[in-house]
Amino acid sequence: MEDKWRWSLVAAVPPVLWGSTYFVNAHFMPADHPLWGSALRAAPAALLLLAVTRRLPHGAWIWRSALLGILNIGGFFLLLFIAAQLLPSSVASSVMALAPVALTLSAWALLGQKPSVVLLIGAAVGAMGVPLLVGVGTVGFEPWGLAASLTAMLMNSIGSILARRWQGEIPVLHTTCWQLLWGGAALVIAAVVVEGAPPALGPSQLGAVAYLSILATAVAYLCWFGALRHIDAGVVGVVGLLNPVAGVSLGILAGGEALAGTQWLGLAIVLGCMAAVQVMPTRHPALNGEPAEREPGD
């Protein structure tokens, strides 16, 4: 149980950092260059981790990291960009709140992690609390935006589980670096094609890029994939509901925003579901993946 709580705390780091990106992007990054904003998150993070690992993908990990880089980084960020153009942020957050359910079901199908009733209920009820928290109203939205948001959520859920399935004995630092390399390259190409040259950045914007790339991307993804190796994917997914919690909290603390009564109710539901899945019994199912793979020279 102590190990589960420790890794649950690690799993809480990514959604908190990702939740802060809404505020940082809105206040510091150029609003008319969203693709370059995404590329400037992924590419420097990849190069930073590559400088540490000094290893490029090899063997089966060439195509694996390319696929995972598109699912978890490149394609994921691109679809989020499309969704952000077509959907209110509250609707997009509510769609992404379905990720715990998608992660749980993907882990069941690909890893053999049969979810408990408590986990399924916690994931579903927690997802229902997010629309209350972010204040979804009756505003209309584009079907294509909804499709982009749903596809992004499913891609990231499946990509996260595949990363766990294929982990072998390759260090998480290496596999995370390789995914960011492929995803970052795809984003840079997309940014050049769609938006042209990168925007000029001032000191505050360079500071924002450093925060987004080092903390909200490199550190966040290392913690995300590390936690997935040690605790059930469904638990990681439910902890991921801290994403909108962090975003709303930062808006209150730094933006002077106030919560309505229904938003407090949504916050209580999300936090209650997170607490419920932490106290359920821990299972250690065998992985239905490929044989363990070692680094050359190990």
Regions found by a protein language model. Give the residues of each.
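Transmembrane alpha-helices of multi-pass small-molecule transport proteins
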Residues: W7, P30-G75, A102-S106, M155-L162, ...
